[in-house]
Amino acid sequence: MALTPESPSSFPGLAAIGSSVPEPPGSPNATLNSSWASPTEPSSLEDLVATGAIGTLLSAMGVVGVVGNAYTLVVTCRSLRAVASMYIYVVNLALADLLYLLSIPFIVATYITKEWHFGDVGCRVLFSLDFLTMHASIFTLTVMSSERYAAVLRPLDTVQRPKGYRKLLALGTWLLALLLTLPVMLAMRLVRRGPKSLCLPAWGPRAHRAYLTLLFATSIAGPGLLIGLLYARLARAYRRSQRASFKRARRPGARALRLVLGIVLLFWACFLPFWLWQLLAQYREAPLAPRTARIVNYLTTCLTYGNSCANPFLYTLLTRNYRDHLRGRVRSPGSGGVRGPVPSLQPRARFQRGSGRSLSSCSPQPTESLVLAAAAPAGPALESPGDPA
């Protein structure tokens, strides 16, 4: 969805309900309405085909995505809740995707009828739900990336944290996302324009542009820079480990890192075009041709919903990584699931050799950690007493 009332790159529901009432060039929805043929005029065959295609595609994405995310929620809560301390983040991601996908029926209905049928409350809820779930997803991914970074490079810090801190972080991501969404939730209103209804914010074009720019910074630019920095440092640590002269064990945490990074990259691939389109519409003076604007709006809309549709496949791989690792710990004889020597900083390795057990056994929370059993000659820790995913 998009929220650009002064441009044709608008939220699909908004683009579908433009009014035929003439408006002055500076009005918020003047260029918006120009992106569609007047609702009083018969639709062309091309419009009918495009509407049918986009409606069918979004409906298919909705069915696949809802089933996939519901399956992820069930599997994660049943299989990992008692043993995997990071399960709450997977639940967060799947829940955000599920809520976002549940808006598809409203969007398809608006595309087909070119009329808003869901009242003032629908305007506020559906527009704000879009930004709420988007921010909840990227904030959760940022927290997960930070956790992986800390588990690999600062393992002792992870075992000293209280048991419920991850639940507090998960709740915090939703509260912060809600805080950023409140302005649009309060400002959206249903406005009558002739025979049609239109969802518009109460603020002016400048405030709207500033708000969208802020949301771009909080959902793409800021988290992107932070996650990029974390993974750059992790990549450097792994490169250093490749030069270390000791036998390395198989590290399930490396696979988990790649899966989390894959989810992050998929988010960027699907939402960056959407945001570039939104900002282009805000800062570009000359509007695109209505047909071009409509096509771009279709494509960016499908990309954002496609992200929530594809994510469950990566979530399944992530939870499977948890289960495989836990199964390996149970089957491993002897010292609590030790699978081989894993590099660490030398002082930490000496501590473990003296104690004869994993540092994670001192943690008050259940974890899925490996034992750091051998000292590296140099370089940062590459496995941690943290979780494998």
UniProtKB/Swiss-Prot annotation:
It is a multi-pass membrane protein. It comes from the Eukaryota. Keywords: Cell membrane, Disulfide bond, G-protein coupled receptor, Glycoprotein, Membrane, Receptor, Transducer, Transmembrane, Transmembrane helix. Residues 1-10, 28-39, 355-366 have a biased composition (Polar residues). Disulfide bonds join C123-C199. The keyword Transmembrane applies. The keyword Transmembrane helix applies. One of its GO terms (biological process) is neuropeptide signaling pathway. It is found in: Cell membrane. GO terms for cellular component: plasma membrane. Residues 78-87, 147-167, 233-258, 319-389 are cytoplasmic. Pfam families: 7tm_1. Residues 1-54, 114-124, 187-209, 285-297 are extracellular. InterPro entries: GPCR_Rhodpsn, GPCR_Rhodpsn_7TM, Urot_II_rcpt. GO terms for molecular function: urotensin II receptor activity. Residues 1-39, 328-366 are annotated as: Disordered. Gene3D superfamilies: Rhodopsin 7-helix transmembrane proteins. Belongs to the G-protein coupled receptor 1 family. High affinity receptor for urotensin-2 and urotensin-2B. The activity of this receptor is mediated by a G-protein that activate a phosphatidylinositol-calcium second messenger system. PANTHER family: G-PROTEIN COUPLED RECEPTOR, UROTENSIN-2 RECEPTOR. This is Urotensin-2 receptor. It comes from Macaca mulatta.
